[in-house]
Amino acid sequence: MPEQLNTRVEDCFLQAESFFKRSFKRPQVSLKLRGQKAGVAHLHENLLRFNPQLYRENSQHFLKQTVAHEVAHLIAHQLFGERIQPHGEEWQLIMRGVYELPPDRCHTYEVKRRQVTRYIYRCPCADSDFPFSSQRHGMVAQGRRYLCRRCRQTLVFTGETRVE
């Protein structure tokens, strides 16, 4: 999987070098990105980070568009310096002129939300549930108390959990 990604990064740099008739410093490439972002270019570290899950699920479009998008950020930074907008004219010029791709700011990949466990707490005064995150539930285990806003009584764990 990373071989194709590295090959595409190199191809993008070769295209830019041919277009601008100069060489560019190659970045370090990492697949350590999670969440909603498909890719991130760290300009000062000369580092590209890509989301392996989104790459696996959308590999063809990812290789074509996302890799070029992130490489274009590094090329724009090396060519035009610090004082440019992330998706400004310079970056758009590279996307259109060098890679002949639309300068799309955001991807449209479907991002699966991670499942979260909620711990159900109740108050003696009302028939209401208070779903706690695992972090807050852990704080209760360490002795922290949470109070009902209505009656000021301590919320009590019911033993129930819910996956959302």
From Swiss-Prot:
Belongs to the SprT family. Its cofactor is Zn(2+). One of its GO terms (biological process) is response to stress. It holds the Pfam family SprT-like. This is Protein SprT. Zn(2+) binds at H69, H73. It comes from the Bacteria. Keywords: Cytoplasm, Metal-binding, Zinc.
